[in-house]
């Protein structure tokens, strides 16, 4: 009798509202691997195998993302219709963050990128020579803005009140370059093979695509290209980071 009453009560009771899924912090999402963190950035190397997907995860701050290889993914933002995102190898994107989503890779190849969380408020966004942020007018991209010299081109991508991002492409015969940064700068290798680095106070390294480095303001960094293949990199300079010496 009691069992019959319980079944009847369950049938007659109003249905409970469905619980919304809870997003995990980005650092807890298993496809996101933290590779660098300081007062300005948290940098994640992201890899999603073919026909796999991330967990629902939260983006709480603005961030940059740059594709390593071509990308074709479904961006499922919580509470919004799904959208397809197609990116070329080395294409840079920017997001204001403050949402949760799932990145679903329905293609037959892995999806790889570098996600760069920006830990300071960014303020106004300006495209310079590339439309990184759709709908934002590009600034004048003149020869004086674009740095071109023998074997190398350096093209400003976009900037905010806090950062400036540029993309450099180097010819195979660009065997060695030395860079002096005037602000703390994030370096991301986008293309190349066996690029070697020499930075004062740090052990020499051999970089592979997707590797990142933090270059201190005022430091000299020398890069060698022993394979004599074309290579490319992204730099993100952080305004106000001149005194950042502890990383």
Predicted regions and their residues:
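Bacterial N-terminal signal peptides
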Residues: 6-15
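Glycine- and acidic-residue-biased ligand/ion/polar-headgroup-sensing regions
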Residues: 60-78, 182-200
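A beta-strand edge to alpha-helix "cap/lid" segment located at domain peripheries
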Residues: 81, 197-198, 203-206, 216-217, ...
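His-enriched metal-coordination microenvironments in redox/metal-binding proteins
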Residues: 55-60, 66, 101, 105, ...
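Histidine-centered metal-chelating micro-motifs
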Residues: 52-54, 89-104, 174-176, 203, ...
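A short, N-terminal "cap"/entry segment at the start of jelly-roll beta-barrel domains
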Residues: 19-45, 50-53, 75-77, 81-169, ...
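Positively charged n-region of N-terminal signal peptides that target proteins for export
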Residues: 1-4
């Amino acid at each position: 009798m009691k069992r019959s009453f319980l079944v009847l009560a369950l049938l007659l009771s109003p249905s409970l509202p469905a619980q919304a899924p809870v997003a995990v912090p980005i650092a807890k999402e298993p496809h996101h691997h933290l590779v660098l963190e300081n007062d300005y950035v948290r940098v994640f190397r992201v890899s999603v195998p073919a026909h796999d997907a991330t967990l629902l995860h939260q983006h709480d701050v603005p961030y940059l993302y740059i594709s390593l290889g071509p990308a074709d993914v479904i961006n499922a933002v919580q509470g919004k219709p799904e959208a397809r995102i197609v990116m070329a190898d080395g294409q840079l994107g920017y997001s204001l963050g403050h949402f949760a989503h799932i990145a679903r890779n329905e293609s037959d190849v892995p999806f790889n990128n570098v996600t760069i969380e920006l830990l300071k408020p960014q303020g106004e966004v300006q495209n310079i020579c590339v439309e990184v942020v759709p709908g934002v007018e590009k600034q004048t991209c003149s020869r004086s803005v674009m740095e071109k010299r023998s074997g190398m081109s350096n093209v400003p991508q976009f900037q905010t009140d806090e950062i400036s991002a540029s993309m450099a492409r180097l010819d195979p015969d660009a065997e060695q370059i030395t860079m002096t940064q005037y602000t703390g700068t994030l370096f991301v290798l986008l293309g190349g093979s066996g690029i070697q680095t020499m930075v004062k106070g740090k052990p020499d390294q051999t970089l592979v695509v997707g590797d990142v480095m933090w270059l201190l303001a005022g430091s000299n960094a020398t890069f060698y290209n022993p394979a004599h293949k074309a290579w490319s990199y992204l730099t993100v300079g952080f305004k106000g980071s001149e005194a950042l010496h502890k990383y």
